[in-house]
Amino acid sequence: MRYLNQSEAQNIDQELFNEYAFSVDQLMELAGLSVAVAISKAYPRTGDGERLLVCSGPGNNGGDGLVAARHLKMFGYQPEIYYPKRPNRTLMNNLVTQCEKMEISFLTDLPSAQEMNFKYRLVVDAIFGFSFKGEVRAPFDDVLKTLKNVKIPLCAVDVPSGWDVEKGNPEGIQPEFLISLTAPKLCANHFKGRFHYLGGRFVPDLLLKKYELELPDFPGTDPCVLLE
């Protein structure tokens, strides 16, 4: 299976939107569902109302996190969301409303690493995706410092936040769980955690062939697959 550089990942996204007529909310829904299913497989519920924290950023990766939180609530978990930089976009506002109507709490302040360890089963990093470049700015610089110190499982969506999409970041957060969306990015070569899933079962065959992705078979009707 071939891993994607940043420009290839961006090109595939644009082709899905422009040539294959997918909408942003369609792909976000499919991606977020695959994140939620993969988390439920890697970390099955051991009781009722297990608490999870989803940290969402201002872009589409953050939207994937909001969708995942909604599905995780439907799966019987109790997600809470930290979403400090909300863009004024109808899609994101709708996702927030959906979560609020499902009684998912939005936190005003980020808990400390110690508080997270005590309160939550795991934390989902849905802050930055493959389009991120440059320095991490406030408030997310402090968020990543906190996430680097948590002892509970950290679950990264597509690209661990703060990592170079191609080179990774040995000094950054080190998630236990990574779900690559569409196809793994080159930085996934530096992932040393326990669970690496591929999610987003929506890439048309013609696009798979064009980019020579050779993705593994998805089991049954699952939207995700555990990579070896």
Swiss-Prot record:
- Matching Gene3D superfamilies, A to Z? YjeF N-terminal domain
Q: Which residues bind (6S)-NADPHX?
A: 60-64, 129-135, 158
Instruction: Give the EC class as a word.
Output: isomerase
Cofactor entry: K(+)
GO molecular-function term, one example from the UniProt record: nucleotide binding
Q: How is the cofactor bound?
A: Binds 1 potassium ion per subunit.
Q: What is its EC number?
A: 5.1.99.6
Catalysis performed (reactions): (6R)-NADHX = (6S)-NADHX; (6R)-NADPHX = (6S)-NADPHX
Keywords from the UniProt entry = Isomerase, Metal-binding, NAD, NADP, Nucleotide-binding, Potassium
Chain sites annotated for binding K(+)? 61, 125, 161
Q: Which Pfam families match?
A: YjeF_N (PF03853)
Q: Where is the YjeF N-terminal domain?
A: 9-214
Homology family: Belongs to the NnrE/AIBP family.
Q: What does this protein do?
A: Catalyzes the epimerization of the S- and R-forms of NAD(P)HX, a damaged form of NAD(P)H that is a result of enzymatic or heat-dependent hydration. This is a prerequisite for the S-specific NAD(P)H-hydrate dehydratase to allow the repair of both epimers of NAD(P)HX.
Q: What is this protein called?
A: NAD(P)H-hydrate epimerase
Q: Which organism is it from?
A: Nematostella vectensis
